[in-house]
Amino acid sequence: MSGTDQNEAVTAPATVEVEAKTPALTSNQLNKLRHEAHRHGNYTSYYTFRSQIVPDPRLTQLQSFVQGRRTLDLGCNSGKLTLELATHFAASQVVGVDLDAGLIAAAHEAKRVALSEGQKVKNVTFEEFDFANTWPLQGTAAGRWDVVMLLSVVKWLHLNNSDAVLVELFKRLFEIVAPGGYLVLEPQDWSNYKRAVTKCPSLKENFKKLELRPPFTETLLNGGWEEVDGWERDEFGFERSVRIWKRPANGEQ
């Protein structure tokens, strides 16, 4: 190698690799992503948002409606309330349904733990499917029910679908609730819809098309339901009402 070659070898500039760094997401951006991932209300920490009173305070006023009755819990989340319907209020059979596989897995685990502790939950089962867009209902959720519950889920059903889907769901539930049975709703104020859309912008287009407004009284009355009870709940962060609708027994007006 010549002296010139040697000098060139020594003085040749080294290649410098610059690592490209992805800018860190802001807390606001992270929150947006989180809410988009849970646009159906399927928050994995949902029950940690509520007080940890056992049983769920909603159930204390529902005991007379569910005791000894076959009860279907639609939008059951991780199954906490579903299991309490059996353990604390002696529903004869309870089925929880949710579209989120992770939440249903958590519900199965909660049942396993409850059984290991000797709790009476053998009459509780869980199913994973989108009940708003699946008919007839599947698995152990099929058949006729004495009580159907839609707690903390009506807003999400409405926002993710349409007025027509919600009306059709109320109609279908009327068909599967036994005469004299009950539909338990926990509607949320329109202001809660607006907050949900602010947190989850992908719901905005559906939101702008909605014309029905909670608590859907006229829609339910027109569908044959009779309102028989209701109360306001004032738990921090979850101020809303619970309404009990009845499918009139045969011969009732």
Predicted feature descriptions by range:
Residues 48-68, 84:
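Conserved alpha-helix/loop element of class I SAM-dependent methyltransferases that forms part
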Residues 69-77:
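Conserved class I S-adenosyl-L-methionine
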Residues 78-90:
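Conserved SAM-binding loop of SAM-dependent methyltransferases across substrates and taxa
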Residues 93-98:
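Conserved SAM-binding motif I beta-strand of class I
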Residues 109-139:
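S-adenosyl-L-methionine
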Residues 149:
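A conserved beta-strand element that flanks and buttresses the S-adenosyl-L-methionine
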Residues 167-179:
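A short glycine-rich, Lys/Arg-flanked "PGG" loop and its adjoining helix->strand segment in the class I
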Residues 179-187:
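Conserved beta-strand signature within the Rossmann-like core of class I S-adenosyl-L-methionine
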